[in-house]
């Protein structure tokens, strides 16, 4: 079974319904199979200024995910990535988390993760 780690942008698009039906179907399938997110994605996603009703729905949505915490191994991998690549800290944490858990990173921003040793998947791409 494949494992998928959803990037924050995918959480936002999916939660807000900002995707075509075919893309939503792809993401829904991934969520049913393996709904995992990094702790940083939880912080980024729940840090959005939701109204009270949206906030409750967002918290329920995230509660369905397996939250992957920071570990010493992930921290070391983040340090190694940032020494070699110009990448934002949250992206480095998400990438290192995907590698640590042998997960495919599901993101719309695959270019942010070019040159890193991990598999990415953009559900917005055709096919």
Language-model features and meaning:
Residues 10-11, 41, 74, 93-94, ...:
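Alpha-helix capping/helix-boundary segments
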Residues 7-8, 45, 78, 98, ...:
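Generic structural signal for small/hydrophobic residues in well-ordered secondary structure
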Residues 1-37, 47-59, 127:
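Short, well-structured N-terminal submotif of metal-dependent ribonuclease cores
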Residues 17-18, 48, 81, 116-119:
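Residue-level signal for well-ordered alpha-helical positions
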Residues 31, 63, 116-117:
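Short, structured coil segments at secondary-structure junctions
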Residues 3, 95, 100-127:
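Acidic, PIN/NYN-like endoribonuclease modules and their adjacent C-terminal/linker elements
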Residues 11-12, 46, 114, 121:
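Nucleotide phosphate-binding site architecture
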Residues 66-108:
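Active-site neighborhoods of divalent-metal-dependent phosphate/nucleic-acid chemistry enzymes
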């Amino acid at each position: 079974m494949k494992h998928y780690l959803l990037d924050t942008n995918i959480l936002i698009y999916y939660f807000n319904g900002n995707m075509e039906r075919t893309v939503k179907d792809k993401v829904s399938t991934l969520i049913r199979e393996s709904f995992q997110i990094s702790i940083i994605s939880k912080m980024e996603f729940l840090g959005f200024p939701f109204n009270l009703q949206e906030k409750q729905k967002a918290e329920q949505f995230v509660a369905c995910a397996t939250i992957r915490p920071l570990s010493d191994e992930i921290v070391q991998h983040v340090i190694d990535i940032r020494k070699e690549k110009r990448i934002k800290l949250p992206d480095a944490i998400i990438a290192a988390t995907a590698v640590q858990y042998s997960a495919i990173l599901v993101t719309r921003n695959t270019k942010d993760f070019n040159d890193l040793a991990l598999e990415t998947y953009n559900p917005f791409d055709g096919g």
